[in-house]
Amino acid sequence: MTEKNEEVVEDKNISDQTDENLTEEIESEADDLQVEPDPKQAEIDKLTEQVNNLEEKLLRSQAEIQNIQQRNARELQNVRKYDGQKLASAVLPAVDNLERALQVEANDEVSKQIKTGVEMTLKTLNQALTDNGITSTGEIGESFDPTKHQAIQSVESDEVESDQIAQVLQKGYILQDRVIRPAMVAVAK
């Protein structure tokens, strides 16, 4: 080999040895820099994780409490809204009986006075029902609605159009938006 080539090879060997020495030195210094984990830092990390978990549980609990409060408010509102349903259901048969009593012909003076008393009583009861959000449903000529009316029969009728109420057998009643009792009706064909 030529002298120049030998120098290049020798320089390369020196360079490789220098690189290896530097690499070993850097690795040695890196090992020295790697310190055992601080036990206090590990405890801090553990406590931080516990705090985060507890905060998450707190948020969930607060959301659950809020949902319960909203549900209770809705239920209370429904109780107030439909408060008179049980009483209305108990009173409606009396209203029906008073209406039937008014259909009887009054011939003498005493019967007429009794009929007037029954009319006043019925008017007072109907006003009390209306004041408490209870309305009647099922009038002749009204369109048949299966959510509010119960069709007992279908009849031929010249007075009303098809699918309208031709005859009311028993009035229905609605409290707010809830049907207490559907009207029993005959529907025109």
Swiss-Prot record:
Listed GO CC annotations: cytoplasm
Keyword annotations: Chaperone, Cytoplasm, Stress response
PROSITE patterns hit by this protein: GRPE
Chain positions covered by the region annotation Disordered: 1-38
GO biological process, one term: protein folding
Bias (Basic and acidic residues): 1-14
Pfam families tied to this protein: GrpE
Subcellular location as annotated: Cytoplasm
Molecular function in Gene Ontology: adenyl-nucleotide exchange factor activity; protein homodimerization activity; protein-folding chaperone binding; unfolded protein binding
Bias type Acidic residues, positions: 17-35
InterPro entries, per the entry: GrpE, GrpE_coiled_coil, GrpE_head
Role according to the record: Participates actively in the response to hyperosmotic and heat shock by preventing the aggregation of stress-denatured proteins, in association with DnaK and GrpE. It is the nucleotide exchange factor for DnaK and may function as a thermosensor. Unfolded proteins bind initially to DnaJ; upon interaction with the DnaJ-bound protein, DnaK hydrolyzes its bound ATP, resulting in the formation of a stable complex. GrpE releases ADP from DnaK; ATP binding to DnaK triggers the release of the substrate protein, thus completing the reaction cycle.
Family assignment from sequence similarity: Belongs to the GrpE family.
Subunit-structure text: Homodimer.
Protein name: Protein GrpE
Gene name, Swiss-Prot/TrEMBL: grpE
